[in-house]
Amino acid sequence: MAPRSSRGIAPAMLCGLSLFLGFPGLVWVQISVPPQSSPHTEPHPCHTCRGLVDSFNKGLERTIRDNFGGGNTAWEEEKLSKYKDSETRLVEVLEGVCSKSDFECHRLLELSEELVESWWFHKQQEAPDLFQWLCSDSLKLCCPSGTFGPSCLPCPGGAERPCGGYGHCEGEGTRGGSGHCDCQAGYGGEACGQCGLGYFEAERNASHLVCSACFGPCARCSGPEESHCLQCKKGWALHHLKCVDIDECGTERASCGADQFCVNTEGSYECRDCAKACLGCMGAGPGRCKKCSPGYQQVGSKCLDVDECETAVCPGENQQCENTEGSYRCICADGYKQMEGICVKDQIPESAGFFSEMTEDELVVLQQMFFGVIICALATLAAKGDLVFTAIFIGAVAAMTGYWLSERSDRVLEGFIKGR
């Protein structure tokens, strides 16, 4: 393969890179993508560049391992010295840098391939860290560790120890982000250098801070014990350095509905529904009612269900009363069913006969078929010379002939033939 010429950074390439990468002096242009039904967050270009460099370095290790591994050491050293910085090796590495489905990696590689070639053939010795040279210095997609934003400003707490080591600096290592510290649980402040709400300083020196949890209801404290509270969380009151639960149900802080009652809980309260028997209540059950609901009556200290069925409340004939909780309903007595608003006798249907669902005409046809079979049997016996059966046969034929010649027979036969 003929060696590729190192052409440097062509102006056309710079314009292409500016669309994706944002060189100094050029405007960062974000290519808009039509909104999709499920939003997809693309990785920051710095992360794509870091992934490309990591894959490139793995490719360097793979190509050395696959091509050399035992045999004549002198021969390998000679060949390795020629292969190590060759274009052949570079092509082998670049072919495996991006996975087939990683579109961002392929796009970045296409736009920066000449830069990678320039580093490979000319810059390796003076800039051995490809990530620093390509992603930070050349493409300006990334920032050094502990810095963020277009100008690579130090994160709160300093670049050496961003966020004091107790949080994450948003955008750290990239040309984006706000630099805001997202502190770990228990830590707070601009650079996570203070203990957060509900925590106290268990240990502190020039470079080290340990924040431990206060006793449960304490918002601020001087130590872990119950008596170390300096400020209480909502729902608690400070009393002699201890946080005591406030009974909101005994104050105007509780706000429950007319048909609810208040139950105090630690640091708060709950509103629960009154019993069905109550119109307003002071607690759970029918014995804590302020007033009884319709359908209930005061019996001693409780609101109990009124049995309306003790009086004649169902005037309908064949009706009977059924008491329900707080009310009643009228139902039909046994052996009756409701039909059009009244209770009627529930007639038990008789057992259906074998021919009960057949029409009259269908029965007539069935009769004709039956008599036809009888006549055939008689004809068979008459053919044997039996005079008695011969006489019966002649009479049956005469009777059937008269029927079939009748008007009714014509109508039945016509309906049977036509399927009516």
From Swiss-Prot:
Residues 30-362, 406-420 are extracellular. Residues 384 are cytoplasmic. It catalyses: Catalyzes the rearrangement of -S-S- bonds in proteins. Disulfide bonds join 46-49, 155-169, 163-181, 183-192, 278-281, 309-321, 314-330, 332-343. The chain crosses the membrane at residues 363-383, 385-405. Its main location: membrane. One of its GO terms (cellular component) is membrane. Its EC number is 5.3.4.1. CDD domains: EGF_CA, FU. It is an enzyme of class 5 (isomerase). It is found in: Membrane. Residues 153-193, 305-344 form the EGF-like domain. This is Protein disulfide isomerase CRELD1. It comes from Bos taurus.
